[in-house]
Amino acid sequence: MNKVFIVGRLAQDPQQFVTQNGITQSRISIASSDNWNKNETYFFPCVAWQSTANFINSYLHKGDLVAIDGKLIRRSYVSKEGKTVYVIEIVIESIKPLSSKNSNNAASSIDKNYNPTNTKNNNYSQQSNMSVSEAMDDFESNFAQKTSSTNITSKNEEKETFKDDPFALNDDEDPDQVVSLDWLDEFKE
């Protein structure tokens, strides 16, 4: 399952684009910190499409606190210098404004105007005065409801599904298989 849930603030105003086919796109960066280490902030690039992008472009601004529900994707493009650039970003499936740094009137305006048509879960699409921990609890309960009805596959079916995935580990064939995470040390301070 590919699912991402992040609570954080917009690091900049949304960047609006329209594709050659006339589809609206919004790009934002979410700044979030760990509960245990408030001194370290992480920035997550995010993209939204169509009605979700229209909502973001119309109502959200730098500094607004939001809860994002989405999925992680990897894409590539060729830079102006001719180099292939690989990007990992979050595709926003739904977004819920939690508070605005700009004004209190923005919240009531968001409530009235945002009615998503392309999101699967409207629970995260409307304004709320929830705290971050309440938003996370709400997400976890909705996530548990969704996954409890999910059909679990057998181990053989799972092997079949991931047989072409070079990153999938199959510990049944090699019980001593170990994945080294030493490369993560270069990102630590």
Swiss-Prot record:
Residues 155-166 have a biased composition (Basic and acidic residues). Residues 1-99 form the SSB domain. Residues 143-154 have a biased composition (Polar residues). One of its GO terms (cellular component) is nucleoid. Residues 100-124 have a biased composition (Low complexity). GO terms for biological process: DNA replication. Residues 100-126, 143-176 are annotated as: Disordered. The keyword DNA-binding applies. NCBIfam families: ssb (TIGR00621). Homotetramer. PANTHER family: SINGLE-STRANDED DNA-BINDING PROTEIN. This is Single-stranded DNA-binding protein. It comes from Malacoplasma penetrans (strain HF-2).
